[in-house]
Amino acid sequence: MSILVVTGTSTDVGKTVVTAALAAAAREAGLSVAVCKPAQTGVAPGGPGDLAEVTRLSGVTAVVELARYPEPLAPDTAARRSGLPMLRCADVVETVRALDDGHDLVLVEGAGGLLVRLGAEGFTLVDLARALDAPAVVVAAAGLGTLNHTELTIRALSAAGLACAGTVIGSWPDEPGLAERCNLDDLPAVTGVDVVGSVPAGSGRLASASFGAAASTWFDSTWLKSTLTRL
């Protein structure tokens, strides 16, 4: 049983699709998978959030969302403005550990970037990962700016004593330009962490069967096998 945190260099870099791809690849390998999204923002009560997309794409139905706020803001800001209770780190830890007891793999998808405040006492995904003793996968953009953003994120993980399991490009264009091609080579050099996967742009629009059949091919096969066989 193992826990893997999925964070990103910013918002809208493809965390949800990468989470779904990891879940689908693990399912294909015969593992039982659960996914936790501690805080969902920008979605009204009853509306489909990120976990609905994870389920649609990967087929994983063991999904847990702990808090939801209607405004598209950082979770602690959204909680204050809505008057709804703030998420507590201890509650998230308890939930994830309970999921871990019954599944081979638990994926925990963050909100926004690594240091976004998630709830009470300003806790972040760093605090959560440390409490869970879990490594993180960093989802990064492909284009200009990603070298700086990704290195900052990985340095923050390292400074907190947390392991980075790899970098995944969340949306790799059909026709990558010069910047994208150079970034693919330069990211490992500047961060010290391998790029272990690239999800093709538009993959989130695939039907479930097509997504599930392709998901494992988007990751480095040696990395994926090593990651899943350690569970």
Curated annotation (Swiss-Prot):
GO terms for molecular function: ATP binding; dethiobiotin synthase activity; magnesium ion binding. Pfam families: AAA_26 (PF13500). The active site is at 37. The keyword Isomerase does not apply. SUPFAM superfamilies: P-loop containing nucleoside triphosphate hydrolases. Its cofactor is Mg(2+). Pathway: Cofactor biosynthesis; biotin biosynthesis; biotin from 7,8-diaminononanoate: step 1/2. GO terms for cellular component: cytosol. Its EC number is 6.3.3.3. It catalyses: (7R,8S)-7,8-diammoniononanoate + CO2 + ATP = (4R,5S)-dethiobiotin + ADP + phosphate + 3 H(+). Mg(2+) binds at residues 16, 50, 109. HAMAP family: BioD. This is ATP-dependent dethiobiotin synthetase BioD. It comes from Rhodococcus jostii (strain RHA1). The lineage of its organism: Bacteria, Bacillati, Actinomycetota, Actinomycetes, Mycobacteriales.
